[in-house]
A protein has these predicted regions:
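N-terminal amphipathic/basic-hydrophobic helices that include classical n-h-c signal peptides
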Residues: 1-25
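Charge-dense, extended regions
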Residues: 258-319
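Catalytic cores of nucleic-acid endonucleases
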Residues: 27, 44, 48, 81-284
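A short, highly charged nucleic-acid-interacting micro-segment common to nuclease
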Residues: 21-42, 62-65
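A short acidic/basic microdomain associated with nuclease active sites
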Residues: 42-78
């Protein structure tokens, strides 16, 4: 927790931080984050673990691409010139998402080198539910419009179960800590920029704050929770797989999103045939699957789902 900091660095960043507090970096925060960040200004005094500290640096860590886990970085000093780093990850109390734009790169940063195994173990654990899903929608069904053909399923991390294709991630306590803290982040996100200076491990959070009603810096300090403690009390992380569909009447799909499970469409004996692929999580994206599907639809003279019938459908997963 305690670190040694060269006084020159602290003095050198002071003016820079004052400029940044009112600048464009603040625009990256949501309203609640911005308000909380505004409480943690240079010179603010607070008590922590029975000692009084004064903030000598406070800002949002940034990097060239993506985001660190730390939302608010605080460097503070006590009367013995001992410095302490507090690195807060802020989460809204009612937020369901932990990660909603999962890519292979992001998965590795969350789960480490075994990320593919982690995701495949999770999706195959509910393989029977995937087998029950409709793939071709000749008619509107529940929330899926007529004309949709499924390309695969995106992968999201949640605080709770969400939908039919959802379940608890198979993770150790240490892996859950890694997800919340960002221990597996790439170097540019771990060693993020704070007030214009690269600070080692500034992007790796050590506290989590889930209370947006705080009104003072002391309340922030009092209500933040060590990530290890938070994980002990909330050890579950859930995943949800959300369908990416090709809308045949519009000839569109919602972007080139990485897919945790893909539908490998092909043509066999004059019929459009699907096969679900679980062992290439997030390595195949929506564009590739859509282009393959469209190629076989063209070969079979299928323009939209109105053209699909018993003669050219190689699956009964049609509604």
């Amino acid at each position: 927790m305690y670190i040694r900091t060269q006084r020159a660095l602290v003095v050198g960043v002071s003016a820079v931080c004052k400029n940044i507090l009112g600048g464009s970096i603040m625009g990256d925060f949501g309203d609640a984050e911005r308000r909380i960040k505004g409480l943690m200004s240079e010179g603010t005094v607070f008590k922590f673990q029975g000692r009084q500290y004064r903030m000598i640096m406070s800002d949002k860590p940034t990097c060239s691409k993506g985001e660190p886990k730390t939302d608010i970085y605080i460097l503070a000093e006590n009367d013995k010139s001992e410095t302490i780093e507090i690195k807060i990850s802020y989460k809204k109390e009612n937020a369901d998402f932990i990660e909603n734009k999962m890519s292979a790169e992001r998965a590795e940063q969350l789960f480490g080198s075994e990320w593919e195994v982690v995701i495949e173990n999770s999706t195959t654990a509910i393989k029977d539910r995937f087998a029950e899903r409709m793939l071709i929608y000749r008619n509107r069904f529940k929330r899926t419009n007529k004309g949709a053909i499924t390309l695969g399923w995106k992968f999201e991390l949640m605080n709770k179960n969400s939908g039919d294709l959802s379940g608890e991630m198979i993770l150790t306590e240490e892996q859950v800590i890694d997800v919340y803290a960002g221990n597996n982040l790439s170097d540019d996100k771990r060693n993020a920029s704070v007030c214009g200076n690269i600070i080692p491990d500034s992007g790796v959070a050590n506290y989590i704050l889930m209370d947006e009603s705080v009104k003072t810096a002391q309340e922030v300090i009092d209500k933040m929770i060590p990530i290890q403690e938070y994980v002990r009390n909330h050890p579950e992380i859930y995943f949800a797989c959300k369908a990416l569909n090709y809308r045949t009447f519009e000839e569109k799909w919602d972007g080139n999103r990485p897919l945790s499970v893909q539908v490998d469409w092909s043509a066999e004996d004059g019929k459009l045939v699907p096969e679900l692929v679980f062992d290439r999580p997030l390595q195949v994206k929506g564009n590739e699957v859509a282009e393959r599907l469209i190629m076989y639809m063209n070969k079979l003279h299928i323009k939209n789902t109105d053209d699909i019938n018993d003669n050219n459908a190689g699956t009964d997963r049609i509604v």
